[in-house]
Each structure stands twice: as structure tokens, then as C-alpha cells.
Amino acid sequence: PVDIDRLLIVTFTNAAAGEMRQRIRDALEARAEEAPENAHLQRQLVLIHNAQITTIHSFCLQVLRSHFHMIGLDPGFRIADEGEMLLLRQDVLKETLEEAYELGAGEVNTAEAEEFRQLLEQLAPGKDDQAVQNALLQVYQFSLGQPWPDEWLAGCRMAYCRPDKEETTPEPDWVRFAVKDTKRVLADVREEILYAITLCQAERGPYMYEKAMRDDLAMVEVLQEADGYRELAKAFAVSGTYTRLSTKKDESVLKEQKEQVQELRAGIKDARASVRVQYFYDRPEVLEETFYASGVVVRALTRLVERFMEKLTEKKREKNVLDFSDLEHLALEILVVHDETGTQASPAALEYAEQFEEIMIDEYQDSNLVQELILNSVAGRGRGEANRFMVGDVKQSIYRFRLACPELFLEKYQTYRERENACRIDLHKNFRSRSEVLDGVNEIFRQIMTENLGGIVYDKDAMLYPGAVFAPDSGEARRLPEFLLLDPEDQDKQEAEARLVGMRIQQMVGSFPVWDAKLSAYRPLAYRDIVILLRTVSGWAETFGEVLGDMGIPCFTGSQKGYFSAVEVRTVLAYLEVLDNPVQDIPLAAVMRSPIGGFSDEALAKLRSASEEQRFYDCCIAYRDNGEDAGLRLALDTFFRQMEYFREKAAYTPIHLLLWEILDVTGYGAYAAALPAGRQRKANLDMLVEKAIAYEATSYRGLYHFIRYIESLKRYEVDYGEASPGTESDDTVRIMSIHKSKGLEFPVVFVSGLGKQFNETELRGRLALHSSFGIGCDYVDTTLRLRQPSLLKKVIQKTSALENLGEELRILYVAMTRAKEKLILTGAVPNASQKLEAWQTLNIRAMETLSYSTLTKASSYLDWVLPALLQHSGEDCFLLRVLSAEDLLEESREAKASDLWRVLEHPKEEPEARRYLERVFSEGYPYEQEQAISGKVSVTELKKQTELPEEHEGLELYP
């Protein structure tokens, strides 16, 4: 047996590590109760408190705390928060560019200075250098995903060095990729041509088209035989034009088959044209020249990034702070000896390797290259032993934006069965979902997940097999997964789709049976059993939340956006800006118009028009001193006195205490809490105070830097989402992103927004980055003012597009596998009927998987899911419904009528409501006597009342 403190167990999050530790402790305690005499179990219960069950960052932190002296690190370092690092990077970026400007403007015209000037001219020809700043930070952030960023940057620069003319160099990897990708497309095209020829030869087929299709086949086969990029380019150049389809008319030919061949021909021509435009858009000699000429940008930019990294490291050492990237790279520096001969474990790594009997890695598919090297260095017990146990599912690798490298997993997945000292264990069973859900997932992904897209063939080894046990039910519930395709017509797509989802929820809640493991019985579906998963919640969760709320469906969005746009947060931040610098017109007007100032629009207009001063602040001061309206002058005096009081306090008061006093003295905190959604607003203001406390723990001080701190968070979209005063445990429908749902499970899952276009912003930037291929950019002719992407940039863009599509495929897989009992896919697309016809044409021949071209041309999840369902009709695995906006309206009417009749026929007994109503209707009116008293009494009546007999002397009068 092995003691638990001799294992290194690494997982993805602190929460997962804590849960794993607790589960192991619970299991040990249970076993110890069964065998109290077992000394080994008792020992593990003691050792588990020191067991290395941790995240990779926590392990790296421990390495740094123990071996700080090896790299000259001050042991008192702390981890900077994201806001502080944003400020620090901005300060260093400014210094770096100022140095570069001084060099570029210097009298000595060095090559570096000239290249920097060209960098500015090509990336930032306008009035500012924001594009250069963005490019520098983009390359810097990307380089941190490489084990040795300096080497990667140098390699990117070296790629643009011309080889000697006498030197024969092999084609670079990125050129070979262009050839490989072209061959994949050509293979698809050839299959399409062969199928078209089959249709031509069929009974009543368009035989007159066969010659043209055979000419196409010959052309494609010539291209396929070309070896290497230059031969392919030459083959494309001489391939000539297409033979026209025959115009011969024959009534015996079926119109449908004729149109099918025409559509196939159009697709064949498009595919060939697209690959030519992608990789062979000019002569190889010209493309080679433009490639080397574009290197000026990469050389200048990589030097800037290197200088930026040096200065940032100096600043961080001065302030004795590290960020999370430093944890990994400094730990790598301690654990790995890296030189021109290669890499090997350091003495420190060998010490750890001796300590750990086994390295266990959870969620291995999300590891990156740096983490792989770190864990590999402490594995093998220093003697090359195979003692790593890795668990993961590459189909769920969805963190490419964090530079996760699923290729690490795939390499082991593909080789471990053949290696002597390795073993691959396939875990086929799924213990979450019903067989109907799994059958639906398998039906779709066996057709769309391939080695070329997604990284793995979805074969019998990758498929899901049911392992969960559900008690038999009545069989009345329709448990097949559903696909609801909506044509919104002239309605807003998001709102229409949200209504569709809401209607389906209303139909299911209270009637659809779900298995409750705690009750060991079926019960009606509740709102808390339902989740709506979206690819992105920004702009979608708000719409779904509003629509569902209007339909009476409680929902919890947990949105990650909206905090800095909340009116109460904007108001307080504007006040802080005014305290820092009162001559800012917009923040000053915002605060004065808010409840803090209490000035009306008319008052602000009067202040602006009463003075010729240009700044609004000066207008206010002038009116305060000499204005006509005494009331307005008094209000201004009160406002500015209070503002000056807070300005003086800001000089020596911690920001969080200043915020508390502002909210208290101005009354704005109480005001916000009294508004509708007051709990939410109060929570938002409390969060702002918490952010101030976090800021005060940084190396920055003062109100000015706090405002910069917040502005940096806003600029780089580090939005924390509105603070939530509620909890996810309430009986509400949850709306969340697919990424947030990873690792979770829900009885009923709606995967919505499938018609949303994939985000391709990354592919349209000035730079294209790749860990293996380097940096691609545009060739710019500054004389002719022409811009053209280099071949390397085109290759990286295509590579990134394929990697993005593979990521989207895996994200869809994660979403669909969250469902336990019912899976419902929804999407809205205009002209749905026409789209269906277009998707149907992709399936005119039965294929085991969709073609490479079909998969890579997808612009939304619908472009994968619907062709896959239409391919084999999917009737046994999915219920497919196409609805129009009118259908939606009609179903809504029917649902409302059905709900009304259900209430009338089967009224629900509510004991508490019954008791309340009985009490209200049975109680007498407590002020019955006062009803006889008049609200108004005339003088005559009063005179009469003075003459009342003695028995009425005690009667009170209420004026």
C-alpha cells in the first residue's frame, strides 16, 4: 500500500480539489468503520490533511515557496489580482512605447528604428497607436502559453530570415499544412464528382452531364497527384476552365436528378475556387517575396514584446508581486533544466519525483504545454518509471482560449495501446443520462466529430453507453430528445426563441415526470430541474430572462455581464471621478442629475446657459457666486461644500471607508436599496466596496489609481456580473453558459441559440498567431497603399478556424451531455423552410459522416445538427419540429386556454391561502363606529352640536 501523502493529485479548480479531498476522507472513514483494526486506514485519515490534492497553480506556488532561492525570488512575494496587473501592464506598456518612440525619433537611423517606424505606419496609420498597443499585448499574452516565451518570440522572428540561395531548405510546417488541407478538400470534391457521375448513369439520369463531370474528375486527379506546394500551385495555374454542362434537352430525364447534379457541380466549383483563393492566389515567387517583406512588422513587434516583458518583470520584482502565469513559468524554471541540448529534470524536480509514488491528473484534456512539462518533470520517480495516471475526455476540451492543448491527450490516446509501459482504459459507461439522451448524442456526433474536426473519431470506443439505472415509469412521457426549429419571420429572433422555450417549459412543468434519487420515486418536473444553456450569455441571458419573466416563469441568469453598467454603480463611480477631478463635464452632470445632487434637467440647462464659461464646472461655480435664483444657489453651495468635504477626506481615507461614508452621508445607499430590485442594487454597491478593499491590497494607492483600476477592468471586459442577492437553489429555471455548466447535470436541458453565428472576430485581426507556425501578418505596400495578407497569415487563419470549429464541436458535446432525462435543442433562423431544403441537399447520398467541406463550412451549430438529423431522418433518436411565428402564437393561445380549463376543472388546494381568505372575510371592520362621523362639519352643525342633550356630551368630533 501507498500512503496518500506520497501521491500528487492535480485537478482543475480549487473547488474540485476540495470536493475530491472530502470524498476521499469520507470513503476512508467509511472503510475505517468497517475495519477499525486496520492501521493503514487509520494512518491515511491522519495523512490526508497533508495530502497533495491540489490545483496546478497551488502546486507551483508550493514549489516557489520551497525553492525561491534558486531563482533569486523574494520569499515575501504575493499574488497580484487581475486589476492590479492590468494597471501595471498599462504603466509598463506606456514606458516601453515611449522608449521606442525616442529610438525611432533619434538622429541615428538604425535598422531597429526604421522597422519600428514601419510598424507604426502599417499597424497604426491613424491618429493614435492603440492598434500597436493591442498587438503588443496580444502577442505577449499568447507567448505566455508557450513554455519558453523568449524562444518562441525569437523563433517567430527567425522564420522571416531569408535562407542562402545555395541552401536547400525543406518546406516549413505551415506550407505543408496548406498542402494537406488542399488535399483534404480535393478528396471531398472527388467523392462529390464520383457521386454525380453515378447519378448521370442512373436510370433516367442526366446522362448528358457525364462528360463534363468526367472532365472535372480528370482535373481534380491531376491536382491530387501534385506533390508539394509549388507543384500544386503550378497544377492550379494550368488546370484550365470547366467544361460547360450540356444544354441538351431530354424529357425522359428526371428533373430532380438533373437539379441534384447541377447543385453538386456548383458545390464542386465553389470548393475548388475557395481553396485556390485561400492558398494559391498568386504565383509562389510573388507570395514568397511578400512573405519576407511582411517580416518587418514581426521583427519590430517581437522586439517590443521582449522589451515589455523585461520591464514588466523588473516592475513585478520591485513590487514583489507575481501573476498566475509567473507561477507556472517560474516553477518550470526551478524544475526543468533547459538548454541547447534539450530539457531534463532539475535536482529539485528529482527530489519531488522521489517523493511521489504516482502522479494523478484529473481533467487532463485541459492541460497546456507548460503544465505538461511541469508535471512530467516530477514524474517517473527520477528513474523514467511510468507513474502518471491521467483521466480526461478530449471531447470535453473546451478551454482553447486558455491555451489548453487537447493534442497532448490525443497523442497518448492514440499511442498508449501500443506502448509496453502504458495502458489505455476506455470508460464507455455514462452514469448520468437516460439511454434516449445518449442515443441522440451518439446519432449526431458519430456524423460530425472526426479526426480532422474535433480531434477524435466518434467510433464505438468514443460513444456513450448507458450506465445509469432509472426505475420504470408509466411510459407516457416523451423522453426522446427534441429539436425545435423556429422561423421567427419578422419577429426578433432571440425573443421569439425565448418564447418558444418558455412555452415548452410551461407544457412540461408539473406534468413531465423526473426521477428523484432522494425520494426514490418519480415526481413532477419543477422549475429548478431545468437549465437553459447558451453559447454566450451576453445579450442572450437578459433577453431570455425578461421573456420568461413576462411569461411568469421564475429564472436565475447569473449573468457575467452588467455590473459596471448598473445605474447605481455608474453613479457612484461618476462621483468618485468628480472627487478626483471636478472639471470633468460628463461625470459632474451625471452626479448632479442623480439623487446625490438632486438637480433637475431644467436646473442643469439654466446653469449651462447662464454663463459663457466653457467648462460646466465653471458654469456651476459662477452661478453659485452670482446667480439670480437663490434656491438654486443654495443647492449648488450645499452640493459643492459636500463635494469639497469628500475631496479633502479622499487624500487620507482608504477608498472603501470613503465609499461607505459617501453612501451614508448622501443617503444614496438607502435610496438605491429602496428602489425596485433594491436587494440587487444594494448587493452591487456592497461589491463595489469589496473591490475597493481588494484594490487597497495592491501596490497602488489613492483615488486616482482606484479609478484607473476600475477603468482597466471595464476596458478589458473583466466584468464580474451583477452581484446576486439570491441563490441558485431557489425553484427557478437557470440560464447559464455552456462553459459554466461543465461538470454539472440537470434533469431537463434546453440547448438554445443554435442559430447564432460562430464568433470569428479572432480571424479578422491584423495578426494571426499560432504556437507552431508563429506570427502571420499583412504585406503592406506603403507607396501604393495596398494591403494583402501573407500566405503564412492565411494558413494560420485557416488553422485557427479549424481549431475554433473543433472547439465549438466539443462545446456542443458538453452542452448536450448535461441532460439526465430530457434534451431539447432549439434554434431560430429566418426562412427556415429554405434552409431545410439547403441542408437536405447535403444529404442526397447517405454517408457515415458529413463531408470535410460540409463540416468546415459551418457557421452555426445548426449547420451541423440539422444535416446530421436529416441524413438518416433521425426519427428513432430525435423529435424534429419546425415552427413559424404563427404556430408559436397559436400554441400560446392553446396553452393559456388549457391552463385555464385545468385550473377550473382541477382547482389546486392551497390551505394557507384558504385560511387567509376565511380570516379576511370573517373579521369585522375595526373602525365601524368612526364611519358615522363626518369628514367635514359646517358652522351650523357645530352650533347644533352645542345644544345636544347631556347623554351625547362624550361624543368626539373629528374635523
Language-model features and meaning:
Residues 761-802:
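Conserved catalytic motifs of ABC-family nucleotide-binding domains
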Residues 6, 130-322, 422, 499, ...:
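Conserved ATP-driven helicase/translocase motor core recognized via long
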Residues 1-72, 315, 319-325, 330-333, ...:
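P-loop NTPase Walker
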